[in-house]
UniProtKB/Swiss-Prot annotation:
Binding site for substrate: D36, R60, G82, R137
Catalytic activity: shikimate + ATP = 3-phosphoshikimate + ADP + H(+)
CDD domains reported for this sequence: SK
Name used for this protein in its record: Shikimate kinase
Pathway where it operates: Metabolic intermediate biosynthesis; chorismate biosynthesis; chorismate from D-erythrose 4-phosphate and phosphoenolpyruvate: step 5/7
Biological classification of the source: Bacteria, Bacillati, Actinomycetota, Actinomycetes, Streptosporangiales
GO molecular function annotations of the record: ATP binding; magnesium ion binding; shikimate kinase activity
Record-stated family: Belongs to the shikimate kinase family.
């Protein structure tokens, strides 16, 4: 079996990387490595707590380490955190991988990350921030993708099926 991922899923928060990743890994009979979950396991705290307690720089450094290891040696499906593609070295490391961009409409992403409910003012405007993130990152996601699948138009199972059909048969 290959020591590189069969597929690497990228996309914004709420795109369904973990959910589609689970469905795809199950369909292919391999493991899913969700880089955010691996970061939490290594740090012993949530991504949110890492950001608050240690800062974004510390989070991004740990994320870079986890992503580099996954891209070099995980033989299943890898789901990257939404911002992992901001790292130049990560973008370079993605070259030659089967990178699947999970595209999502803003309204669906907002709903999936819980921004469709009333929020206290002290949070600022998280919907505007999410919209800005989607707009800023879109060209990067598109430039890295070898395949794009809409998770607004397809269920996670349908998305996994579409991705699986595009992957080479085992041994190719």
């Amino acid at each position: 079996m290959s020591s590189r991922p069969l597929a690497v899923l990228i996309g914004s928060p709420g795109a369904g990387k973990t959910t589609v990743g689970r469905a795809l890994a199950e369909r292919l009979g391999v493991d899913l490595l969700d880089t955010d979950a691996e970061i939490e396991r290594r740090a012993g705290k949530t991504v949110s707590d890492i950001f608050v307690e240690d800062g974004e720089e510390a989070f991004r450094a740990l994320e870079r380490e986890v992503v580099a290891e996954a891209l070099a040696s995980h033989p299943g499906v890898v789901a990257l955190g939404g911002g992992a593609i901001l790292n130049e070295q990560t973008r370079a490391d993605l070259a030659g991988h089967r990178v699947v961009y999970l595209e999502v409409e803003f309204a669906d992403a907002a709903k999936r990350v819980g921004l469709d409910t009333a929020r206290p003012l002290l949070l600022g405007n998280p919907r505007a921030r999410l919209k800005a993130l989607l707009r800023e990152r879109l060209p990067i996601y598109q430039s890295l993708a070898t395949l794009t699948v809409s998770t607004s138009e397809h269920t996670p199972e349908e998305a996994a099926e579409l991705i699986a059909k595009e992957l080479p048969a085992a041994g190719d």
